[in-house]
Amino acid sequence: MKKISIHDLMKWKQEGKKFATVTAYDASFAQLFEQQEVPVLLVGDSLGMVLQGKSDTLPVTTEEIAYHTRCVRAGSPNSLLMADMPFMSYATPEQACENAGKLMQAGANMVKIEGGEWIAETVRVLAERAVPVCAHLGLTPQSVNIFGGFRIQGRDEAKAEQMVKDALTLEAAGAQIILLECVPASLAERITKACTVPVIGIGAGNVTDGQILVMHDMFGISANYMPKFSKNFLAETGDMRKAVTKYIQDVEQGVFPVAEHTFN
């Protein structure tokens, strides 16, 4: 696989070519994903739940994300590698710069930040300092205590309008990717069409430019439960490499996710 950059993703959006993304946490799986040509990987703070057994992502630290970023980069030198900025690691633009620097030095090509237009200044400051940003909207797991659990977001018109505004504000501030989690497919379509940057979805229908799954969900090995928006590709194929290839093909062909994985 050739080295993937944000310019490739922008080109694919313009061409209408969909792309697959998956989380990764170690060198071995990162290598497998690169060999199967997954173009974008995310070292997610989901590691707190799927690796550490925590009930949410809040305890994860910047140092832990940096460690796993180094591991993933060692296994996948050519993917576009995003790294999550953990809870309270970007409370101020200054703090965000310090912690984003650690993740970029660990091998990330981009950092992912959760939040709406209130993080626009942080996005702007990072972008001005050569740190590309993916802005995460919708169900932002670090806000689980505000939401009262892991719940679909943007169902009423006022919140939907605010999310569209958030996406456009963050793009204007310099965000190079928008990630939408657990939002109605109709809202995801509005945002995908409104934004000029690539939009990645999870639980957001099949109209976004890209899709992302947690690798443990994709392989059906999550300890607790299978989210509505996920699919066990390993059960369908019986082989990890074939499962990854099937996931990529289904995303590119627009046949994953289908209605059963989508919120209305």
From Swiss-Prot:
**Cofactor needs:** Mg(2+)
Q: How is the cofactor bound?
A: Binds 1 Mg(2+) ion per subunit.
Q: Which residues form the active site?
A: E181
Q: Which UniProt keywords apply?
A: Cytoplasm, Magnesium, Metal-binding, Pantothenate biosynthesis, Transferase
Compartments annotated for it: namely: Cytoplasm
Top-level lineage group? Bacteria
User: GO biological process: any one?
Assistant: pantothenate biosynthetic process
Residues holding 3-methyl-2-oxobutanoate: D45, S46, D84, K112
Q: Which positions are tagged coiled coil?
A: none
Name the Pfam families for this protein: Pantoate_transf
Matching entries from SUPFAM superfamilies are given as: Phosphoenolpyruvate/pyruvate domain
For this chain, one GO molecular function annotation is: magnesium ion binding
Residues reported in the UniProt entry to bind Mg(2+) = D45, D84, E114
Cellular component terms per the entry's GO annotation? cytoplasm
The protein's annotated catalytic reaction(s) are: 3-methyl-2-oxobutanoate + (6R)-5,10-methylene-5,6,7,8-tetrahydrofolate + H2O = 2-dehydropantoate + (6S)-5,6,7,8-tetrahydrofolate
- The answer to keyword Coiled coil applying to this record is no
Identify the EC number(s): 2.1.2.11
CDD domains named among the record's database cross-references: KPHMT-like
- Pathway(s) where this gene product acts: Cofactor biosynthesis; (R)-pantothenate biosynthesis; (R)-pantoate from 3-methyl-2-oxobutanoate: step 1/2
Family the UniProt entry places it in? Belongs to the PanB family.
Q: How does it assemble?
A: Homodecamer; pentamer of dimers.
Tell me, in a sentence or two, what this protein's role is. Catalyzes the reversible reaction in which hydroxymethyl group from 5,10-methylenetetrahydrofolate is transferred onto alpha-ketoisovalerate to form ketopantoate.
* UniProt name for this protein: 3-methyl-2-oxobutanoate hydroxymethyltransferase 1
Please tell me the species this chain comes from. Aliivibrio fischeri (strain ATCC 700601 / ES114) (Vibrio fischeri)
Q: Which gene encodes it?
A: panB1
